Amino acid sequence: MSALRPLDKLPGLNTATILLVGTEDALLQQLADSMLKADCTSELKVHLARSLPLPCSVNRPRIDLIVFVVNLHSKLSLQSVEESLCHLDAAFFLGKVAFLATGAGRDSHCSIHRNTVVKLAHTYRSPLLFCDLEIEDFRAAMAQRLVRLLQICAGHVPGVSALNLLSLMRGSENPSLEDL
């Protein structure tokens, strides 16, 4: 097992692959199913992992986007994501990593403060999305958003690159780190 690198495999023709990393297996599977139902012009492949590193596999396709899913109700979820981040090559953070925080709808039950996840995403200069994956409509909307983000990261949207999208998303961030 070694660090995951973005360009260690050749891209598949009209194929986009996303890796969802998180400790909530049921929520990840539901999100993956919603993504596969979403309208996509590319062949969509969704892989799930509880943590990184991934076992070495010759058959694994190139991963175009990694989404780290943090459940705000579980400190284990945050710890697993933090430990997994060190197993990524730095080149992945050039527009091919995103964080997804779930469970923010019920603040009273959160064991992780939102600012902790905001600071984590800011540290790695990666976009942070919030969504309550337990609600089907929200999950479907997030699945569509992730599919579109994946198509851009895979290079299937003319005129837009992952790095370009990252700079656009970073420019639209509301709070600065100093305000937190």
Swiss-Prot record:
Keywords assigned by UniProt, alphabetized: Centromere, Chromosome, Cytoplasm, Kinetochore, Nucleus
Entry-linked Gene3D superfamilies: P-loop containing nucleotide triphosphate hydrolases
InterPro entries in the cross-refs: Centromere_Cenp-M, P-loop_NTPase
Pfam family, one: CENP-M
Entry's localization field: Nucleus; Cytoplasm; Chromosome, Centromere, Kinetochore
GO CC aspect terms: cytoplasm; kinetochore; nucleus
Record's subunit section: Component of the CENPA-NAC complex, at least composed of CENPA, CENPC, CENPH, CENPM, CENPN, CENPT and CENPU. The CENPA-NAC complex interacts with the CENPA-CAD complex, composed of CENPI, CENPK, CENPL, CENPO, CENPP, CENPQ, CENPR and CENPS.
Function of the protein: Component of the CENPA-NAC (nucleosome-associated) complex, a complex that plays a central role in assembly of kinetochore proteins, mitotic progression and chromosome segregation. The CENPA-NAC complex recruits the CENPA-CAD (nucleosome distal) complex and may be involved in incorporation of newly synthesized CENPA into centromeres.
Protein name: Centromere protein M
